[in-house]
Amino acid sequence: MDGEMTASPPDISACDTSAVDEQTGQSGQSQAPIPKDIAYHTLTKALLFPDIDQYQHWHHVAPMLAKMLVDGKYSIHQQYEYLCLFAQLVAPVLGPYPSPGRDVYRCTLGGNMTVELSQNFQRSGSTTRIAFEPVRYQASVGHDRFNRTSVNAFFSQLQLLVKSVNIELHHLLSEHLTLTAKDERNLNEEQLTKYLTNFQVKTQYVVALDLRKTGIVAKEYFFPGIKCAATGQTGSNACFGAIRAVDKDGHLDSLCQLIEAHFQQSKIDDAFLCCDLVDPAHTRFKVYIADPLVTLARAEEHWTLGGRLTDEDAAVGLEIIRGLWSELGIIQGPLEPSAMMEKGLLPIMLNYEMKAGQRLPKPKLYMPLTGIPETKIARIMTAFFQRHDMPEQAEVFMENLQAYYEGKNLEEATRYQAWLSFAYTKEKGPYLSIYYFWPE
């Protein structure tokens, strides 16, 4: 483009006007209310974007991100730090902005984007998180058909600013779980065309940043579907094979065997893998599954690994799940592909966390919320926070949700809060996260 772009679009307005002194930097004297997204508006006055795609991504994501940082009680300094990091590092790798009629590389994060926001809630407070698939325009025009190169370019930039990021596992696991340059060279054009046609979503990597008050924790998700189509193995076999390839001393083998036994019993072939981008000796591996049979009985079966997890944390967590499932009114039944496409319904998901020295895998359940009115979800969450010693979250959850979707009718909307994930330990209590979809 000839010129660079800055300034906020004229129709962007402040939504929620509550703020506190330490978050806004105000003196505390009687003044006009300060909008929650003031940091976004302020930075917009000083940011230049080299193209319209980055400009649109900034104005699409940053207002909600700014509000979440205020709601999470981040200091004013960290609010600006994390918003700047989004503008400088993340927005440049979100790819062409997906507009109607524009034939560009597609990802389904947040429902229809290459980026997704989520919040984690614990008794200690809330944490804002951002997940995205690094992508550049080359993936849309055929130069990088499987979007293999953008993630490496992103990590080279991230490591300059976040010194704690260690990408050793990225290199080790990519070889086992993603289509490599060598794999692509070994496939003929007919095979490549088949994979490009069969996989409407070609995502192989997703990066997630936990924006903690103590600093950033980076995670990477590996989706082995395309690799498995080329090699003939199942996703679950690929994930466990990759773990064993990097866990050469076998610290995780007994945990893997426990999960594998359940997968075999339940006939689960598809899976994907996540790890923390830290020293490999200290990382957590998480094996994920999705199941279109959305029933409480099926969720219970997966939560307990078919009865293999009988510890106190699993038992207490299961009782809480039963209550939440009933109160929320999770839409149940076998989920056909047409329901996912036409009605926007989602499967249940779980992950199983493993770490060296851990005796048992730790399950986490993702309950699909699409199809349930947003205000109903918010009321259930508010009551849950009240029961489980999270009074600050209970007080503001409904108000915050409305601020994220300003002007939207949350009594009628059913597709903004997409997932509720839940885990439990006696030490920390309930661990919940809400994953948000963007308005269509």
Curated annotation (Swiss-Prot):
Residues 1-33 are annotated as: Disordered. Residues 20-32 have a biased composition (Polar residues). Its EC number is 2.5.1.-, 3.4.11.17. Substrate binds at residues 108, 116, 223. Signal peptide: none annotated. Pfam families: Trp_DMAT. It catalyses: harmol + dimethylallyl diphosphate = 6-(3-dimethylallyl)harmol + diphosphate; an N-terminal L-tryptophanyl-L-alpha-aminoacyl-[peptide] + H2O = an N-terminal L-alpha-aminoacyl-[peptide] + L-tryptophan; (R)-benzodiazepinedione + dimethylallyl diphosphate = (2S,3R,11R)-aszonalenin + diphosphate; (S)-benzodiazepinedione + dimethylallyl diphosphate = (2S,3R,11S)-aszonalenin + diphosphate. Transmembrane segments: none annotated. GO terms for molecular function: aminopeptidase activity; prenyltransferase activity. One of its GO terms (biological process) is proteolysis. CDD domains: PT-DMATS_CymD. The keyword Transferase applies. Keywords: Aminopeptidase, Hydrolase, Prenyltransferase, Protease, Transferase. Dimethylallyl diphosphate binds at residues 129, 219, 221, 286, 288, 366, 431, 435. The keyword Protease applies. Changing residue 131 to V: Strongly decreases the enzymatic activity. Belongs to the tryptophan dimethylallyltransferase family. Accepts only dimethylallyl diphosphate (DMAPP) as the prenyl donor but shows broad substrate specificities toward its aromatic substrates. Also shows tryptophan aminopeptidase activity with preference for linear peptides containing a tryptophanyl moiety at the N-terminus. PANTHER family: INDOLE PRENYLTRANSFERASE TDIB-RELATED, PRENYLTRANSFERASE ASQH2-RELATED. This is Cyclic dipeptide prenyltransferase. It comes from Aspergillus fumigatus (Neosartorya fumigata).
